[in-house]
């Protein structure tokens, strides 16, 4: 993928250049997140910041600009998760919030809700490493559920419910809250009832996590 970083220097049409770079760097993020390969993810962040943002003006192409900000947020989120890095996770939050400056619920409700869910994930990961952003994560997830309803988009709804379950499960252990542990298990049950196996396999060892939350609940029950 070294050619992706060099492509901006080629004398080609700006739209072709942008499409080429964007396609390459999205593959780079997918590969980096899958292995995981933090080096690949950092290269992707560099391309987003140094190559794509300069040719994706918010004033001229606001939707393209917001898309780059969103994808930048995803790459930073993967790095933050792999390295327990509050710095990258905070930068991911900033990138998602910038994307939401352009992507409005009224005009692009599904995209808006998806970015809210991604913002919630960044806040949740910050909370897990001591960032104290649990309420911000919950607010973002609640916003996503305003659009991603079970009736209209069950898979998206279940993915948000899964994220809420992960948030509340860890939060309940930190603050020793029985009601929160029970709410976490309810959310995880909602998710597992709807999501296909391949979706669940990409999140974490969910069965083990559910057992951990059940143990927390049982301990709090006394």
Model-derived regions: residue spans:
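Defense-system signaling and execution modules centered on TIR/cGAS-STING-like, death/scaffold domains
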Residues: 1-35, 42-55, 186-189, 203-222
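Flexible helix-coil transition and linker loops at the boundaries of alpha-helical arrays
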Residues: 1-17, 34-35, 50-65, 100-112, ...
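Hydrophobic/aromatic packing residues within the alpha-helices of TPR/SEL1-like helical repeat arrays
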Residues: 1-2, 41, 48-52, 89, ...
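Conserved alpha-helical positions within TPR/SEL1-like repeat arrays
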Residues: 16-33, 63-81, 110-125, 156-166, ...
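Short coil/turn connectors between adjacent alpha-helices in alpha-solenoid helical repeat scaffolds
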Residues: 28-43, 77-91, 124-136, 170-183, ...
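Amphipathic coiled-coil alpha-helices
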Residues: 40-41, 68, 88-89, 115-116, ...
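Eukaryotic tandem repeat interaction scaffolds
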Residues: 94-101, 105-155, 159, 164
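TPR/TPR-like (Sel1-like) alpha-helical repeat modules
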Residues: 139-142, 178-199
């Amino acid at each position: 993928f070294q050619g992706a970083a060099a492509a901006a220097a080629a004398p080609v049409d700006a739209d072709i250049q942008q499409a080429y770079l964007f396609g390459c760097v999205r593959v780079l993020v997918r590969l980096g997140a899958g292995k995981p390969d933090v080096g690949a993810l950092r290269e992707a962040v560099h391309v987003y910041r140094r190559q794509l943002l300069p040719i994706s003006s918010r004033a001229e192409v606001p939707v393209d600009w917001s898309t780059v900000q969103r994808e930048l947020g995803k790459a930073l989120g993967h790095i933050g998760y792999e390295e327990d890095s509050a710095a990258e996770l905070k930068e991911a939050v900033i990138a998602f919030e910038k994307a939401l400056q352009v992507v409005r619920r009224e005009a692009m409700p599904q995209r808006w809700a998806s970015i809210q869910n991604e913002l919630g994930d960044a806040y949740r990961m910050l909370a897990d490493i001591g960032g104290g952003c649990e309420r911000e994560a919950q607010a973002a997830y609640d916003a996503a559920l305003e659009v991603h309803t079970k009736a209209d988009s069950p898979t998206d709804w279940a993915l948000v419910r899964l994220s809420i379950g992960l948030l509340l499960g860890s939060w309940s252990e930190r603050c020793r809250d029985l009601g929160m542990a029970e709410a976490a298990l309810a959310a995880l049950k909602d998710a597992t009832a709807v999501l296909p196996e391949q979706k669940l396999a990409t999140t974490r060892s969910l069965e083990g996590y559910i057992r951990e939350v059940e143990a927390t609940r049982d301990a709090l029950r006394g």
